[in-house]
Amino acid sequence: MAAPVSLQVEFGGGAELLFDGVKKHQVTLPSQPEPWDIRNLLKWIKQNLLKERPELFMQGESVRPGILVLINDADWELMGELDYKLQDQDNVLFISTLHGG
């Protein structure tokens, strides 16, 4: 059984507008049989934090193209993307690079 994981989840670049304008969220993910990874975190975010228009944040089980994901200030592509196993006190930042004109 994986222990609960405490994280700071942040949204920027306009992505925070989908989360009632709140940029920083301190979250504790409950214990579950498998370790928490980014894939499961995204499902949790969709169910618990996302307030409107999920299609602007997610596509399938991942984030939409144009949303940069940083884990502890490193690009998630260097960390294993959806398969990265979350550690207690990780900081996960989602930044939208999509802007209207």
From Swiss-Prot:
SUPFAM superfamilies: MoaD/ThiS. The keyword tRNA processing applies. One of its GO terms (cellular component) is cytosol. C-terminal thiocarboxylation occurs in 2 steps, it is first acyl-adenylated (-COAMP) via the hesA/moeB/thiF part of the MOCS3 homolog, then thiocarboxylated (-COSH) via the rhodanese domain of the MOCS3 homolog. InterPro entries: Beta-grasp_dom_sf, Mopterin_synth/thiamin_S_b, Urm1. Its main location: cytoplasm. GO terms for molecular function: protein tag activity. There is a cross-link at G101 (Glycyl lysine isopeptide (Gly-Lys) (interchain with K-? in acceptor proteins)). GO terms for biological process: protein urmylation; tRNA thio-modification; tRNA wobble uridine modification. CDD domains: Ubl_Urm1 (cd01764). It is found in: Cytoplasm. Keywords: Cytoplasm, Isopeptide bond, tRNA processing, Ubl conjugation pathway. Pfam families: Urm1. It comes from the Eukaryota. Pathway: tRNA modification; 5-methoxycarbonylmethyl-2-thiouridine-tRNA biosynthesis. The modification 1-thioglycine is found at G101. Belongs to the URM1 family. Acts as a sulfur carrier required for 2-thiolation of mcm(5)S(2)U at tRNA wobble positions of cytosolic tRNA(Lys), tRNA(Glu) and tRNA(Gln). Serves as sulfur donor in tRNA 2-thiolation reaction by being thiocarboxylated (-COSH) at its C-terminus by MOCS3. The sulfur is then transferred to tRNA to form 2-thiolation of mcm(5)S(2)U. Also acts as a ubiquitin-like protein (UBL) that is covalently conjugated via an isopeptide bond to lysine residues of target proteins. This is Ubiquitin-related modifier 1. It comes from Gallus gallus (Chicken).
